Amino acid sequence: MPPRGGAIAERALRDADIVQEKDGRLYAMSGYSGLSVIDVSRRDGLRVLGTRRMYGTPVAMYLRDGVLYALFSGWRHVVPDAQGGASRREFMSRVEALDVSDPAEIQPVGSFDLPGKLTEARLAGGVLHAVTYEHGSCFGCAAAPNTTVTSLAVGDPADIAVIDQRRFIESAPSGYWGWPSVSVSDDRMYVASATWNGGEEAGRATIQVVDISDPGGALVEGARVEVTGQIASPWQVDEHDGVLRFVSLPGPWQPDARPGIQTFSIVSSQEIVPLGATELDVHPAAALRSVRFDGDRAYVIAEYADAVLTVDLSDAASPAEVGEIGGTRWINHVEPRGDRLFAFGAHNEAADGTTLHVALFDVSDLANPTMLERVDFGGRDARVVEEHDRIHEAFAFFDGLGTLAVPYSEPSSEASSWDCRTRTAGIQLIDFTRDTLAKRGAAATRGPARRVLASGERLVAVSDVGVEAFGIEDGGAPAKVADIALATLADSTVAVDDIVVRIGGASLEIAPAASPGLAEPIARLDGAALYTDAPGCQRYLGNARLFAHGQHVYVLAQTGNAAFTRLAIVDVGDPAAPRVVAQRDLPFSPGALYANPSGALVSAGDSVVQAGSTLVIRGVSDDGYYAFEEDRPPHEAWLDLLDLSDPLNPRHSSVALPDGAGHTGLQLDGTTVLVSRWTPLPDDPSRARFYLDRIDVADPSSPVVRAPVNVPGSLLAFDGASSRLLTTDYETVETPVVGREACARAFASNAAFTPAAAGDDAGPGVCRGTRRTLKLLDLGDTSAQLLDESPMDDTAAVMKALAGENRAFLSVEDAGHDGRSSILVAGGLQEGSLNTATQEVAGFDPSYGPLLLADGARLLVVDNYWPTLSVLDATDLTALSFETKSELPGYVYHVTLSGERALCSWGYGLEAVDVGP
């Protein structure tokens, strides 16, 4: 939480940071992994004592008598539909009380939900004061935008209850500008807000006072103070010795005004009397970066200014700007410590390219501050890790050690190209005395450190992904003595026997198949090992595709050159010691790994298929975005073949595919690759002839392209045992309609309206669109015979299609029924008779990137709108079964199977969901 300066929060208001240490235990909250309790009592070790998965944005944490109060915004709620339809997910704020006396068995004790976004909270005794903002459309919120202050009784964590509440309605909700800013003192809360209609009328800013001095939790509405300018940050407000003072910014309705300081006498919470005011010597265009109050002083940092302004507040009725601190550039943060001031910022002056600095100033004479010393560190384009309003929480002083720790990140100095630049994280140590600074070494950290703590002679760094401990007693560079992971980084996975290989955070990790989501893996292979000749390019691993054969994992990923794809082969025969046995760049674009046809064409294949130790990648010349269609090159297609039978010597070859105007994705039958294409008719380019091509890749060095077969439509599914083929055929039809909107609803694909009267889009006319038909064929060596067919609804837009076993699955959105979603299943290939069935999917939103995975007669459905994993069992087409197996914690990027469990990768986590019968 932002610091409150001066006398603010001096009594029983407890520290609310999301990381705390007590009695040798570290309590850390993360939006990715929830709560972790770590034993930090040993100098050379760290040990996870317990965890608790919680999904929300952590705001604050309080620890008292073995109970931890965790405060969240964005806490997920699943709300059942009153009519029995699909449930929906909503978000609120939440207070969660947890018994952490036994970290191995963290137990929920009680909870309380608050509508809106939690912006501020303070605990005093048995009372928790919480401030939420309700924007009017949030779940459970009041109709009008408002800021609500609530006092909660938390003395009995099992019975958290409202004591009192005050709601402040925004006076001009349609013109509301920005979030409210909340500042807290011992006895009062100050809720600052601004309203402006965006026009010529002047806006206004106010500070609403709320008295919170009652130890029983009663809230008393105090004065509403009109102020000049706006208060956009809690840094700007402070209460000291009965005086309210703040630095205000010009509002957007005050383009020529300057920032200023205003002071008020606090007679009582209900009576706030103006005392004094002064403008600051800052250009109107310079936004306020930060303010630090320190007793009778204030330090004001303006954006794009080269100085920190010093303000004398000893005479509250006559605040005065008295000096400035120069000799630095771009100050991010200042830390007053008596008559000394530490300033942290950035510059571009150093000859060695360093861009960050810490400076020490003597401010005993506020009118004439003097720089005593400055230490530069960090490489070019280095930057602070923490966001501005929380920078003070990462900027850590260890007075007992005389050491200052500053987390930062910088571009890798070893990047092989600009495109491969990645950022590395570290913590710079600086020794300090009253008058000196001395640069020490830097500790390299796995992730950007959010908090830094001192524990004995150790420095403990906490990031979103882990905790690391460094020895700092030798006066030189810190030495890492222990580290543990808190979050599982997983962008994609592949199962290999009894292990799971996952990629995330520019690393390749090995986890047991029994516990694939373990934060601490069996082994971790730094992504740099897959790019030894291209340093920094491991940043692209997050988009890699993974394949496995035997004890080897094949990794296909981007490089710093868009014309090449990186291949790495990793031997995981010894899960504790994975090793890269081959790596090289292949001469084709990584776009080929993901590209598939879209639009009106129904294509059920993939861009990459695997036949044992052979990978086959479909390449086309005209994939990608072109600003002008005339710039798109002529369509050509080919297959890139990777023979990986000798992992130490991977071989690449390619074979051209027969000419066509376009090609579908690839399917595989044994060692035969199937792909369909279409060619426009010479005498009628609006019509096309489709062909099925088969390429035998049993010997990838000599692929055999078999004779094409003319088939009605594009490839949807193939059954090798019966040699039967399912296609989607296309026909252009016309129908009379009234109005362009009716035409758009009549056809899902290529709908074009021609009005009977030119320009009359609402009148009668002709609608031209594409009609599609599913067709089942017997496939021979050179010809195909039609067995059965089934027309599709004209309004059914196929969003995605997959081939299963003896059936195909099509995700459909109905253009004629308000986007109703369903899954169409077409089966009967082996039987020779086409059967279809439809499963409606309530609440499913295809625009949110759903993931579909065909598994025999089942389809796994990841709905990323309200993240859930469901299974459609189409074993019996007369009795489809659709069951939601699990809610998911976040947006899922990749799903694969490991036995009877679906592995759902969502970037900062891996969820294993049982999808068995």
Stretches found by the model and what they are:
Residues M1-P917:
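Feature marking well-ordered beta-strand scaffolds used for ligand recognition
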